[in-house]
Regions:
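Bacterial N-terminal signal peptides that target proteins for export
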Residues: 2-14
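Low-complexity, acidic/polar, glycine-enriched regions of mature
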Residues: 27-196
């Protein structure tokens, strides 16, 4: 009788331990590889103080480590090739790749690497990190919204995030044509990652 009771207690503890392990696994940090076809880096600048001109960086890459239960363990890395700048005007894009602006020959990447992630509210996070452009690295802090998550038709689990923020291009040494092109650059980044 005593042996049977010990056996039942042992089984109960074992099942409880399994539940704890599996529940912790369910909320462990997950790594997502950015899907370049569904990730956008869009920017806008004001031309002559009159109207906005929009552009984008095609084919951004990177990864997101997301820990829903411990957001401080999350991390983001993202890169875009400066040669992939695209404003839908070939002549302007060629100029943007020149030493006057992105200097794509010498500085092929613009990149961001997070240093901290903090949850602000449901689906909203504060991400601080380093933005590198033209060989200069500057700290930035942005508010990021989790926009959705779920399986795609092929069985991959995807997660989306979006942020909008502004920088001054002069902070990175890009000061050509300051009167004709605004110093302030507004950016929107929409990222979709595939769980690995």
């Amino acid at each position: 009788m005593k042996t049977q009771r010990v056996l039942i207690i042992t089984k109960f503890i074992f099942v409880l331990a399994l539940l704890v392990i599996f529940s912790s696994l369910a909320y462990a940090a997950e790594t997502y590889k950015l899907d370049p076809a569904h990730t956008s880096i869009v920017f806008r600048v004001k031309h002559l103080g009159i109207a906005y001109v929009f552009g984008r960086f095609n084919g951004p890459t990177g990864s997101i480590v997301f820990d829903e239960s411990a957001p401080s363990k999350s991390a983001v890395e993202m890169q875009a090739e400066t040669k992939n700048v695209d404003t839908a005007v070939e002549k302007r894009d060629t100029h943007l790749k020149s030493p006057d602006f992105f200097n794509a020959g010498e500085y092929p990447l613009v990149s961001f690497k997070s240093k901290s992630v903090k949850k602000l509210s449901e689906n909203t996070y504060e991400v601080s990190g380093d933005l590198t452009l033209l060989g200069k690295t500057r700290p930035i802090t942005v508010k990021v919204n989790a926009t959705g998550a779920g399986k795609d038709p092929w069985g991959n689990f995807r997660r989306g995030f979006e942020t909008s923020f502004s920088i001054k291009r002069s902070d990175f040494g890009m000061d050509f044509m300051m009167g004709g092109v605004s110093d302030e650059v507004n950016l929107t980044v929409s990222a979709e990652g595939i769980r690995q």
